């Protein structure tokens, strides 16, 4: 039994399945942890989600910003843009069932025995592990609720970038969503920056990568995340594991087997990725 970590598949189904074959992933005994952004930009979002749905308890998923966008588009809250490649998914007779399954996925996975954490963008350096767990549960509860569309209408907000215990309920949810699915950089006081996507090679003070900020969590846990293809594995100290290698941008999909630390990769093949 092995555990594999991957992120940002982005509808690149062909590359994903080849990578699973390369790694000898066994869907009867192995486990797959995916750090979000299953869909969008690549041509086969529907096939990716259908396959993961078929794995049932063999897959552990945290949602990324593009997964949330798909749910919002399906609910009629956001426009279906051409670059999403969502048409096939939205027209599928399975779309409602698959969307409902996605809505019940997590924003944070924690394995206390192995001291492993996974989220899409990362973990706010302003949180300790207990606050992070509570905040994840709060947004998971809203997204899985029957009135999830109302939640999604209110959740997008760029100005909620600083954590305080006295945040009102809605702003608390907004901050949590920004932290788990959107942040890359922080300011020295801990405020999140959701806009800069560049490699740290090209970014100067006052911005710092979130994983270089002081944090009680990284002293205890190995942290797996995606969302940031321009990192290219550089500038990232242990115990952080960046998983987004930019497959949908014409680069590669990567996967780590936890037990022996072996990395697997598959170069971009799809012709419709953007």
Curated annotation (Swiss-Prot):
Enzyme kind, highest EC tier: hydrolase
Gene3D superfamilies for the chain: 3.60.21.10
SUPFAM superfamilies: Metallo-dependent phosphatases (SSF56300)
Keyword Cell membrane in annotation: no
Known catalytic reactions: P(1),P(4)-bis(5'-adenosyl) tetraphosphate + H2O = 2 ADP + 2 H(+)
Known EC number: 3.6.1.41
Top-level taxon of origin: Bacteria
InterPro entries: ApaH (IPR004617), Calcineurin-like_PHP_ApaH (IPR004843), Metallo-depent_PP-like (IPR029052)
CDD domains named in the record: MPP_ApaH (cd07422)
Alphabetical UniProt keywords: Hydrolase
Record-level Gene Ontology MF annotations: bis(5'-nucleosyl)-tetraphosphatase (symmetrical) activity
Family: Belongs to the Ap4A hydrolase family.
Classification via PANTHER family: CYTOCHROME-RELATED, PTHR40942
UniProt-listed HAMAP family: ApaH (MF_00199)
Role summary: Hydrolyzes diadenosine 5',5'''-P1,P4-tetraphosphate to yield ADP.
Protein name listed in UniProt: Bis(5'-nucleosyl)-tetraphosphatase, symmetrical
Organism encoding this protein: Buchnera aphidicola subsp. Acyrthosiphon pisum (strain Tuc7)
């Amino acid at each position: 039994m092995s555990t594999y970590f991957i992120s940002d598949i982005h509808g690149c189904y062909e590359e994903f399945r080849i990578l699973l074959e390369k790694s000898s992933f066994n869907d009867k005994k192995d486990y797959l942890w995916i750090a979000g952004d299953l869909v969008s930009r690549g041509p086969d979002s529907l096939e990716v989600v259908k396959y993961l749905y078929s794995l049932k308890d063999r897959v552990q998923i945290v949602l990324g910003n593009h997964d949330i966008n798909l749910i919002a588009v399906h609910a009629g809250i956001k426009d279906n843009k051409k670059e999403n490649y969502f048409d096939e998914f939205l027209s599928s007779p399975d779309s409602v069932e698959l969307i409902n399954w996605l809505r019940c996925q997590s924003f944070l996975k924690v394995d206390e025995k192995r001291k492993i954490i996974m989220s899409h963008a990362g973990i706010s350096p302003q949180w300790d592990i207990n606050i992070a767990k509570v905040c994840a549960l709060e947004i998971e509860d809203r997204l899985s609720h029957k009135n999830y569309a109302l939640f999604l209408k209110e959740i997008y907000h760029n100005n909620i970038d600083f954590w305080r215990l006295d945040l009102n309920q809605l702003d608390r949810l907004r901050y949590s969503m920004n932290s788990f699915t959107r942040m890359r950089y922080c300011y020295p006081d801990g405020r999140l920056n959701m806009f800069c996507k560049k490699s740290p090679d090209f970014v100067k003070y006052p911005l710092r990568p979130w994983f270089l900020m002081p944090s009680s969590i990284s002293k205890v846990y190995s942290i797996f995340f995606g969302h940031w293809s321009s990192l290219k594995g550089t500038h990232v100290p242990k115990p952080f594991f960046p998983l987004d290698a930019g497959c949908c941008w014409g680069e590669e999909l990567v996967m780590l087997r936890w037990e022996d630390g072996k990395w697997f990769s598959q170069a971009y093949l799809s012709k419709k990725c953007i």
